[in-house]
Every structure is written in C-alpha cells, then in structure tokens.
C-alpha cells in the first residue's frame, strides 16, 4: 500500500539520485573526454561499462527530478536504471570470467549503483501514490 505522506524521504532519495547522477557524469566525462592522464588514472576501465554509466548519469538526474516532484514514473525509471545497471554488471562479470582486464573498484561501483537504484525504487514505489 503506497504511503504518500513521506515527502521528506522522497526528497532525500531525489537528492541522492541527482548528486549521484552529477558525480557520475563528471567522473565518466573526465575519462571519456578528458586528458590522457585521466584515462591512465582510470586504469583498466571497460568502455561499455563506462559509456553506460556516463549516459545513465543523465537518467539519474531525470529520475531525481521526478522523485522530487513525486511523479510515479520516476519510481519506474529507478527500476529501469536498477535493471539496466544489473544487466551491464552481468555482462561485465562475463568479461571478467573470460579473463578481461578490469579494476576492482569497478566491481564495487557497480555493486553500489545496482543496490542504490534498487533501494530507491523499493522506497519510491511505496511512497508515491499510483
């Protein structure tokens, strides 16, 4: 049963989503479009993971704005982000199992991203009335 009474919690979730999105865009953009030094500092990054996360950063911001405005579609967008991130994480896991080069911090980051978006969806879907 939705609990539409918790605007504060949704605002916190929205702020987390927007901040996470802006940081993702900045970090991913610096590797994709920045200097060679930025790419070297990133180590063995995986291009499809990097591109997905960079583009998803923009979706994070849109989802955060929707959550702030208490729009039901924002909860479904959060689910889409969680599922998409999990799918890219699974493809990344296959790359690792096949012996591809990677950074351990990417495993941690993808775990965090998947968890954060699953939690945001679970929370928002219970707080925004249909």
What are the residue ranges of the model-derived segments?
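Topology signature of small-to-medium multi-pass alpha-helical membrane proteins
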Residues: 1-130
């Amino acid at each position: 049963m939705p609990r539409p009474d918790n605007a504060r919690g949704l605002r916190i979730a929205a702020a987390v989503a927007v901040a996470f999105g802006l940081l993702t865009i900045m970090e991913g953009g610096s590797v994709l479009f920045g200097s060679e030094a930025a790419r070297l500092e990133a180590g063995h990054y995986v291009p499809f993971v990097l591109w997905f996360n960079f583009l998803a950063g923009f979706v994070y911001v849109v989802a955060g704005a929707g959550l702030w405005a208490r729009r039901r579609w924002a909860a479904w967008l959060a689910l889409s982000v969680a599922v998409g991130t999990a799918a890219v994480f699974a493809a990344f896991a296959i790359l690792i199992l096949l012996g591809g080069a990677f950074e351990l911090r990417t495993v941690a980051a993808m775990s965090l991203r998947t968890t954060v978006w699953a939690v945001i969806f679970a929370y928002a879907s219970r707080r925004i009335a249909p």
